[in-house]
């Protein structure tokens, strides 16, 4: 999937609610790719379903390699590291960060507690995937 770099200055976004456009979503994805080097990014929630309002948040599942430095952190700390990439963003951003191994375990050993992740993987929109 070819990517086009969009210049977007996250340091200059005001704190009031900002409309989330496709350009903003692309810029968020590109920044995560540049700074985190994920294996995959999946958009989910109202934006993936097409039911979002112009001020709806961005929901992302970010899958990282188990050797990625973020993999050493707990889930909420991984989330915090992603949010630090977007100071003064002016829009809601919810991110679930899992390792490839955690995703594999969810798929193969799910006992109901990970149904949301399975739904995201099945119904979400892939925004980025590393080339093999």
Each PLM stretch: what is its role?
Residues 44-46:
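Glycine-rich beta-strand-to-loop/alpha-helix junction loops that act as flexible
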Residues 1-40, 49-54, 64-132:
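Catalytic core of pol beta-like nucleotidyltransferases
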